[in-house]
Amino acid sequence: MRVLFLLLDMPAPDKSGDMYVHLAEQFLQNGHSVTIMAPDVVHKLSFVGQERGFRVVRVRSKETQGVKSMYKKGFALATLDYYFKEAYRKFLKDAQFDWIIMPTPPITLSGFASYVKRRSHAKFYLILRDIHPQSVWSIGLLHNRVEYWFLDQKARKGYQSADIIGCMSPGNMFYIKDQYPTLKTGELTLLYNWVKAPEFVTDKTVRARLGLEEKFVSLFGGNLGKGQRVENIAYLAKHYLPDENIVFLVIAKGVEKERLQRIAKEQNLTNIWFLDFMPQADYLNLTSSVDLGLVSINESYSVPTCPSKAVSYMAAGIPILAMINPDNDYGQIIEESGAGYWTAGSDKQHAVELFDMIYKDSNLRKKMGKAGKVFYQQNCTVEVAYETMINQMEKHQNGE
């Protein structure tokens, strides 16, 4: 197949790949022709080249990553469609594709995906990893109803244009059906988050190097944006401050990291340790040496969401404690898989009770970690993601 990936971000060749680059690599390794279009904020002109074995079109664009101003980020995302069309006409106007694969965010690129679909007579696979604008509206990041309407129209067109919509949980699938009952969308299918895990190296010195040799280490890793409730981490840290054995290790980037650092300083939470963000392979190997993985989602979130950091915890074989929005079936997933416990983010006392249970029972931690790893191996490897998608795509092409 000839496949075009539309990505919001693509790490430079000398950096570790992310989940979408790893997925594209699976397509390439299985004999498919892969082209990637991704933004470039450094150069003033778009350009095409070879990276990681792919044909890559780097599209001149405005910065969308790590932007604190929602207005600047919104404007940058809104202009992506224009810049992508410009680069497509310059470099790919005669190219033919069988499938277009695009993850969300950003839903604002769905118009461009529809444009390529018409020009190339291709099929469109939408990987739904965030549901806009409902998600940002529910946590107060979007207030203007005109902007909401604009984004909602973009979302509707994307759902209508897609031939297949890969949802990260059954709750996601139900939410789309419930929000758009009269909308004729693409086929809704289940596609869990995935991560390409390295061969984990058991490094018994890693704790000693970090000064954590005798500590109970709870890790919060990945993104720290507005969708994560940093107060949940701070609350647990404050509660367990008298216990010198417990450390909360934060390896994250995002607009809320500075706020958590400020809270930790103001409240003298010396048990919150911050490490710089690191390559994924190094991060996953470090993850395998900690005792507990933490998930925190803003309890005001109105949409079901399954954070990718939880998949990393499962891959590393560590138990999970999730403080999440109550309308989220992610809690059900980790509970039924046996990978951990969950509670509503607003129920801080229950979070403490669950933390205590995991902290005081090493056998429970081992049992949860093992169960999580089994779930990961069966559902969340990049190989499983590829096989799931390619089977769905082939069935769709065959009219099944």
Label for each model-derived stretch:
Residues D40, G171, L191-W194:
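Carbohydrate-associated surface elements
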Residues D14, Q228, P279-L286, G293-M314, ...:
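Nucleotide-sugar-dependent
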Residues M1-R55:
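N-terminal subdomain of nucleotide-sugar transferases
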Residues P242, I251-A252, K257-L284:
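Nucleotide-activated donor-binding/catalytic signature segment of Leloir-type glycosyltransferases, i.e.
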Residues H350-E353, M357, L364-Q378:
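A short, well-ordered alpha-helix in the C-terminal region of glycosyltransferases
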